[in-house]
Structures are given as structure tokens and as C-alpha cells.
């Protein structure tokens, strides 16, 4: 019996390990099982010698965090124990293809770095964002959609990137918020 699964992507330009998805059967959603599973994943990436600088994931934050589902709240606790921080900036989870336009949701990016940080420059944040949106989401759909569908999806990614970019002023330093205190 399968108890769970996870999906990760390695984005080599910025050396990002991006956690796309993690699912665990209901009977295993306990601290005593979920946390060791997550820790094993973290150890796996460490033991493989994969040269990474950033570990990033996203968690939905609908209506200013008023509607965080139980699983997301639990994952947030686990990320706090693993010393992740919340990137305090506008973000959204992109649509899951062209036919699911309503699937994009407000979200937060959660970040763990190889070196301690408490703020990100706008430039670094935008590099990380570009890598996630273009090298991960956009490139995924480039091979999954027809040419015309991909052009539409690509333009959607461009528009959303520009929307987030314009929401951050040039001199902004983006705070990294402790998961525990937020």
C-alpha cells in the first residue's frame, strides 16, 4: 500500500529544489509519521550531494490566510521545524494549465537557504521568482500543451510575473518571516 508521494523539481540556474507536491494518506497524517517522512526527504537531497542553494515550496494563502486548509497548516508547522521562512511578497500559485484558469490562488513562497538570510533584495527575489515561473511552470506546460495553448499560457506567466514585479518597489528589501511567529 502506498502511504504517500512527493514531487520535486531541481532548477539548476539558481540551484533551487522546488517542492511541487506532497501527499500522505490520512492515516499517516500524524507528527510521528509526517515529520520523519519530510526529514527523510531533506536528508535525501543532502546525501545525494545535489548542490543547492535554495529549497522552496508554496502554500496557498487564500483571502489573506483566512482559508488555509488543514493539510497546508500542518505542512507549515513542519516547514517551521525545518527552519523555513515565509517570503513576505506577493505571490500566486499559477494556473494548472489553460483549462483551469481558476486554479491559480494567492500563496506564499517558503524558503530555506544554505546560508542564513533575513531579507532578500528585490533582484534576488525576482531571480528566484523568474526561475520558478519560467523554468518550472512555463517549461512544464511548453511540452504539455499545443503550440497555441502554450502561447496563451506563456503570456499568462509573463503577465503574472510583471504584476508581481510592479508590486515591489526598486529599493524594497523583502522580509523573510519566521514560520513559527506568523
Language model region names:
Residues 24, 29-47:
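Conserved acetyl-CoA-binding loop-helix of GNAT-fold acetyltransferases
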Residues 13-15, 29, 64, 117:
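Generic "edge-of-domain/loop-turn" microfeature
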Residues 2-3, 37-40, 88-94:
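Short amphipathic alpha-helical surface micro-motifs
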Residues 9-12, 47, 100:
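Generic marker of residues within folded, mature protein domains
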Residues 1-26:
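A conserved beta-strand-loop-helix scaffold within acyl/acetyltransferase catalytic domains
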Residues 1-8, 48-59:
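Short N-terminal helix-initiation segments at or just after the protein's N-terminus
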Amino acid at each position: 500500500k502506498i502511504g504517500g508521494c512527493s514531487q520535486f523539481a531541481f532548477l539548476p540556474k539558481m540551484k533551487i529544489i522546488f517542492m511541487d507536491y506532497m501527499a500522505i494518506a490520512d492515516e499517516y497524517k500524524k507528527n510521528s509519521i509526517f515529520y520523519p517522512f519530510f526529514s527523510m526527504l531533506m536528508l535525501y537531497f543532502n546525501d545525494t550531494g545535489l548542490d543547492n542553494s535554495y529549497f522552496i515550496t508554496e502554500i496557498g494563502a487564500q483571502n489573506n490566510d483566512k482559508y488555509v486548509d488543514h493539510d497546508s497548516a500542518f505542512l507549515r508547522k513542519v516547514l517551521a521545524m525545518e527552519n523555513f521562512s515565509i517570503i513576505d511578497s506577493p505571490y500566486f500559485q499559477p494556473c494548472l494549465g489553460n483549462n483551469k484558469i481558476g486554479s491559480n490562488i494567492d500563496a506564499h513562497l517558503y524558503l530555506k537557504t544554505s546560508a542564513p538570510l533575513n531579507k532578500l533584495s528585490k533582484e534576488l527575489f525576482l531571480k528566484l521568482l523568474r526561475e520558478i515561473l519560467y523554468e518550472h511552470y512555463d517549461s512544464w506546460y511548453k511540452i504539455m500543451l499545443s503550440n497555441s495553448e502554450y502561447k496563451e499560457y506563456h503570456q499568462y506567466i509573463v503577465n503574472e510575473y510583471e504584476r508581481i514585479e510592479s508590486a515591489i518597489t526598486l529599493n524594497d528589501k523583502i522580509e523573510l518571516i519566521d514560520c513559527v511567529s506568523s
